[in-house]
Amino acid sequence: TLSLHDALPISHSEQLIPHMDEILKDAGVDQKEITAIAAAKGPGSFTGLRIGLATAKTAAYIWKVPLIGVDTLEALVWNLVGARAFILPLLDAQRGNVYAAMYGSFDEIWQEAPAEAASIDEVVKAAASHGGPILAVGEGAEMYREKLLAEGIQVAPPHNCCARASSVAMAAFVRWEKGQIDDPLQLMPNYIRRSEAEVLWEKLHGMN
């Protein structure tokens, strides 16, 4: 798994491809050795998802390698593979809301509840009634640590709460082995909800 953690300039779209070339060179990997591309497809930052996924799709098309899209919440679960608990991945959705789902991580990983955008209070209430050991992970878990702990939901250590390219790769590898390959022309970001800009535009134009 190759990943780049250096901060990128504001013009992400212009800098991403050169940085990909740079990390391949630093790792001593030739582009021809790349056999597949994995990319997080959301939820998450609207702009980040568009740029990241568009870059992955372009690279997969040009390099003629398979593309596997991975749910961002599922990738967080792979940070805790083998935890033998139910995993509650949480990402900040702003204004007291989070992107959330529920997964089981025992002998294998499976999805218990679908991804949604909801208030943290609603998510905590639902999770607390789920039963079984529950471990929250992600930036949302860090933000609402005290609220989660108050309901008996454990929170993963900070170093396990960040997004990891390696976790995206592990989740993608499982799909790849099952032949679950995405069409670069059809794979779209999974925003879950509309952006604030779209909501504001509709309000300004009198649309519901």
Task: Label each PLM-derived region with a short phrase.
Residues 1-8:
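Short, small-residue-biased leader/transition segments that mark boundaries at the very start
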Residues 20-35, 123-134:
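Phosphate/pyrophosphate-binding loops at sites that engage ATP/ADP/AMP, CoA/4′-phosphopantetheine
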Residues 23-27, 62, 80, 165-176:
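Stable alpha-helical structural segments in soluble proteins, enriched in small hydrophobic residues
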Residues 27-32, 61-70:
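Phosphate-handling active-site elements
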Residues 38-67:
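DPxDG-like acidic metal-binding loop motif
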Residues 66-162, 191, 196:
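Surface "functional belts" at beta-alpha junctions
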Residues 156-208:
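Acyltransferase
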